[in-house]
Amino acid sequence: MSVSAFNRRWAAVILEALTRHGVRHVCIAPGSRSTPLTLAAAENPAFIHHTHFDERGLGHLALGLAKVSQQPVAVIVTSGTAVANLYPALIEAGLTGEKLILLTADRPPELIDCGANQAIRQAGMFASHPSQTLSLPRPTQDIPARWLVSTIDNALAMLHAGALHINCPFAEPLYGDMNDTGLVWQQRLGDWWQDEKPWLREARRLASDKQRDWFFWRQKRGVVVAGRMSAEEGKKVAQWAQTLGWPLIGDVLSQTGQPLPCADLWLGNAKAVTELQQAQIVVQLGSSLTGKRLLQWQATCVPEEYWVIDNIEGRLDPAHHRGRRLVAKIADWLELHPAEKRKPWCVEIPRLAELAWQRVVAQRDTFGEAQLAHRIRDYLPEQGQLFVGNSLVVRLIDALSQLPAGYPVYSNRGASGIDGLLSTAAGVQRASAKSTLAIVGDLSALYDLNALALLRQVSAPFVLIVVNNNGGQIFSLLPTPQSKRERFYLMPQNVHFDHAAAMFNLRYHRPENWEELESALAGAWRTPATTVIELVVNDTDGAQTLQQLLAQVSHL
């Protein structure tokens, strides 16, 4: 019997089973122990293959692919710390709902906890963060192939959102020519190999029931809060809220067009809060809210009912309101709960939103970080998409910009870390093949710098704007100790990104005014390549501008 040959047949069943559940993208890192899985993926024509030398970046690449494709994405890594590097992407997927299938090669049981090289306790190492964990046995013909395929089918059928960790131990030898070992074992699956359906088909009902008293609540004074959702859902939510006559507070990731822009500014005005207190019901569609003032209002509002609708399970309401948690796709829920045409009941909030917008527009000419956030709408590629980083940049765009309704916007706003942002953006571009604008801070870019390797070959223009404010200026908005702020919070690195771009053979610009930025963008959108644009801005101007605008709007 050839161990290596049977390992490959075992792996081939696993990979083929994945195709029956919509897996098309497979992300592969180099490794020896993962050879059976890698070869099985490479030989399966159903897959689009992606490779990267860094497992942490690979996990985030898969995350970006899953965000756009809305299908599960598989990741193959070798044993040891390679597996641990998937943790950040796994955690993010668990919070934002993308489906990741993590295929982690492992040493066989007899090599664990005995000093063997590259052998760690992988089974269950991700604790409660995966939606499901499956620890497979060592490949053996004593276990029928139908057990293996039905086990994979069951796990995937139960995967509503988040990650599935499949730990796959393989004994040596890992290399060798294929022979007939295990062929009969494999052939017992019969015509399943020529079919396109899962071996085991399970149905799981997730659709939310219609709220029978909706006809009553839609006649009340309501507020719509829009969190993370798809572009199509964003347009539908905007129309739904407009028909109801309810004010819509749209997050930067809502893609609703934010009809009441600058919400994070005007929510700091007591007049707005007083008017919102008249709401009898708040309907929140989508989770992962960004704005600080929005979260503060959400935490203190006390409507008669607070409904949260999202396709992800769990409470998703850090303020723990009395109300209803409805698990459903937003578009499906809207169809079940149609709006009734009513006059808008809010008068003060539209006025404050317009005045806040005017205050922001008045400062747009200064070349700075806050002004870039406001102007970002003007720089979006036609028929393209936007990827927004974390920390200060996403807060500035949320507070100061008004993105077009239905324009695709992506971000990692689950755990909201700055790790893996460039890798995620690369996945977003690969899955869509659209022109992509990504905007991150300098520390975020440094954190994931080797992801520039993923951006060397793109299928459409990709522009990476690095806002270099020399450190983590988000901490300038927080009451961090002044004497300790620079060394222990901001951590300025005093670097530029021209050499990084050159190392990966990427185009590079460092504009010093809006005209130079617009010229660089115009050239970048004509070229199917990656362009790094570094905006060197005053360290604290972005945070200070936001604070000044908050103070101005609060006194309107």
From Swiss-Prot:
Cross-referenced CDD domains: TPP_PYR_MenD, TPP_SHCHC_synthase
EC number: 2.2.1.9
Catalysed reactions, semicolon-separated: isochorismate + 2-oxoglutarate + H(+) = 5-enolpyruvoyl-6-hydroxy-2-succinyl-cyclohex-3-ene-1-carboxylate + CO2
Coiled coil found in the keyword field: no
Cofactor: Mg(2+); Mn(2+); thiamine diphosphate
Signal peptide (from-to): none
Highest taxon listed in the record's lineage: Bacteria
Pfam families, sorted: TPP_enzyme_C, TPP_enzyme_M_2, TPP_enzyme_N
Role of this protein: Catalyzes the thiamine diphosphate-dependent decarboxylation of 2-oxoglutarate and the subsequent addition of the resulting succinic semialdehyde-thiamine pyrophosphate anion to isochorismate to yield 2-succinyl-5-enolpyruvyl-6-hydroxy-3-cyclohexene-1-carboxylate (SEPHCHC).
PANTHER family given in the database record: 2-SUCCINYL-5-ENOLPYRUVYL-6-HYDROXY-3-CYCLOHEXENE-1-CARBOXYLATE SYNTHASE, PROTEIN PHYLLO, CHLOROPLASTIC
Listed name of the protein: 2-succinyl-5-enolpyruvyl-6-hydroxy-3-cyclohexene-1-carboxylate synthase
Organism: Salmonella typhi
